[in-house]
Amino acid sequence: MTEKLKNSKEVIAYIAECFPKCFTLEGEAKPLKIGIFQDLAERLSEDEKVSKTQLRAALRQYTSSWRYLHGVKLGATRVDLDGNECGVLEEEHVEHAKATLAESKAKVQARRKEQAQKARDEEKSKPKTKKAPQQRRANKPQAQKPAKQPVETRALNADELITGKAVNVNMGKGNMAATIVEINKDDVRVQLSNGLQMVVKAEHLRA
């Protein structure tokens, strides 16, 4: 018996493997043909790994991702499952994608602020414990702790700016580990270790 795929992420990876000229897992995604769900359902109707419900949910997740919405722009062409062109995007679809992308980014930003505020509130609500007075020691010099050495990083070379490269993002107060997901001239999309994605300038990336 064929084992069904467990979630939308696995389904997206599977259909990208079956239809590589239409679906991608990295870089800018291509706008999909209108009605592609029906084509997909027909082509995979005999496939026991995936159901129509899973396909519909996976398509919804794929087309609402920032990577896909970035690819919906004026002049871009829709493609079918085999990568054949199916007409240029209409302006109203481009504007809708822009609005959806802006709304999605605003929600993420609001969620981050809410989490940061919650963390601050929890910190304030913690009971403060009074430190017991330290007994003075008779003229015993305290051993100095060795200073913590900062992790040394360096600026990335141009040939190191590749998708999948593990890098550090300079966040001002320190570096955060990340992986390069997409490169668009000087703008680089990275995924942080906590799963969040963000666009930064190449000059802020370090090895």
From Swiss-Prot:
<dbReference type="InterPro" id="IPR036442">
    <property type="entry name" value="ProQ/FinO_sf"/>
</dbReference>
<dbReference type="InterPro" id="IPR023529">
    <property type="entry name" value="ProQ"/>
</dbReference>
<keyword id="KW-0694">RNA-binding</keyword>
<dbReference type="Pfam" id="PF04352">
    <property type="entry name" value="ProQ"/>
</dbReference>
<dbReference type="Pfam" id="PF17516">
    <property type="entry name" value="ProQ_C"/>
</dbReference>
<comment type="function">
    <text>RNA chaperone with significant RNA binding, RNA strand exchange and RNA duplexing activities.</text>
</comment>
<feature type="region of interest" description="Disordered">
    <location>
        <begin position="100"/>
        <end position="156"/>
    </location>
</feature>
<dbReference type="GO" id="GO:0034057">
    <property type="term" value="F:RNA strand-exchange activity"/>
</dbReference>
<dbReference type="InterPro" id="IPR035236">
    <property type="entry name" value="ProQ_C"/>
</dbReference>
<protein>
    <recommendedName>
        <fullName>RNA chaperone ProQ</fullName>
    </recommendedName>
</protein>
<dbReference type="InterPro" id="IPR016103">
    <property type="entry name" value="ProQ/FinO"/>
</dbReference>
<keyword id="KW-0143">Chaperone</keyword>
<dbReference type="GO" id="GO:0033592">
    <property type="term" value="F:RNA strand annealing activity"/>
</dbReference>
<dbReference type="GO" id="GO:0010608">
    <property type="term" value="P:post-transcriptional regulation of gene expression"/>
</dbReference>
<dbReference type="GO" id="GO:0005829">
    <property type="term" value="C:cytosol"/>
</dbReference>
<keyword id="KW-0963">Cytoplasm</keyword>
<feature type="compositionally biased region" description="Basic residues">
    <location>
        <begin position="127"/>
        <end position="139"/>
    </location>
</feature>
<feature type="compositionally biased region" description="Basic and acidic residues">
    <location>
        <begin position="111"/>
        <end position="126"/>
    </location>
</feature>
<comment type="similarity">
    <text>Belongs to the ProQ family.</text>
</comment>
